[in-house]
Amino acid sequence: MNTLPLDEDSCYEACAGREHAWDGHFVLAVTSTGIYCRPSCPARLPRRENCRFFVSAAAAVAAGFRACRRCRPDRLPGEMGWSRREDLVGRVVQAIRDGVVDDLGVAGLSERLGVGVRQLNRIFREEVGATIHQVNRTRRAHTARMLMDHTDWRLGEIALAAGFGSIRQFNDVMRAEFGTSPRGLRRYPEPETARGGSGRIRLTVRLPASGMQAATAMRAALAAHAVPGVEKFESGTLTRLVNTPAGAALARTDVMGRVELDLPALGALAPTLGAVRRWLALDADTATADALLSRDPQLAQLVAERPGLRVPGVVDGAEFAFFTVLGQQISLAAARTVQERFITSHGRPAPGLGEQWRLPPEPAAVAEVGENGLRESLRLTRSKAATLHALAIELAGELRVDPWTDRGETRSRLLGIRGIGAWTTEFIAMRGLGDPDACPSGDLVLQRALGLATSRQVLARAEAWRPWRSRAVMHLWTKESYL
């Protein structure tokens, strides 16, 4: 099964109209040429009988098609629509985007999801039209193509950085994806790559992104919450520390898709790119969300003023959960102060990056400090120290805060911690879980913006926004300058 967002005739009509809004939702494959394209491809529309439609680029490649060199579907954000799905297949797609398959393998992923490998592969293939390995292979190929566009690296370096196990595998996959060898794809642009004297790797890339018209609001939201030690906002640019299995990396961005990377090794590239895409919500389906929210009289003007507004994600889910608890019921300025104190007191050195950067502490290390130690080092109330300690114990155990976890189970675990209520849980869901339909209905600023008095009234009002309640909340918070 290849579950398309439209019936095939409607897909063809969208391609005939070259509708950019459908880019990333499906691809058009042409049997007479053997290529697949984005729906908005400017090439002449093929005859209907020569068209096939696939829900993902990987499914088209698995069926024997290669990427169009004119519309470059590999430059699109990842397949959209998956972020609002919390079923098993949606969670696997999110995990592939985050590089989890490279890290754990399919067997490790299936264990984390609590599903047998064969069952997981079968369900995924029926829904997506390609195997987990094939979708992950397509992700690697698109990363490699991006590096060819932006660096002068040797092909062997590109293969390693993109996650390929060998040059032969790299050559075979690139030929299957693009119809030619890696050498045939090379254009040798003006390089934006440098190697520091410390052996670190620096390069600039432009990541595919959808709807960046509201980048100013996104930048303001991230800047307002930037915590020294792990983040820095300076001259309109955000810099973020990323912890990878290969070491500590830095990502500097204008949030428009341009990213300057400072890497400890080639192996840090893929996890850093995944973290940045998640942090900036670059795969968000902004067009579909805007279309639905624009129907609401109270939101229509806000959407018109900030089309494409996204809800920021996070780089480190455990860190974000700690920060959210530390920021409960205090001002934003006070929250940043105690969050910085947390990083300074309990964070770890970031090798190769200087003293201004600190890796966030592992949950087990925070749990080891104990309630009294946290209360004294962070100057917390007894109740907040107890909540932070209980959260650390859960995070050191089975609690996960990431976009590919079970959202319902994570919410239940969070609500089971004394001191964590609905607002904290929904805020963590909005950003840490990447849930597009989270709704912190008890938020006083949200209630004021809507002119409502109770959480129940907000929930009733927000029913019309499903499955994009998080985006609606972001619009209302931005309107109220509550970032």
What are these regions (language model features)?
Residues 1-483:
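HhH-family (HhH-GPD) DNA N-glycosylase catalytic core used in base-excision repair
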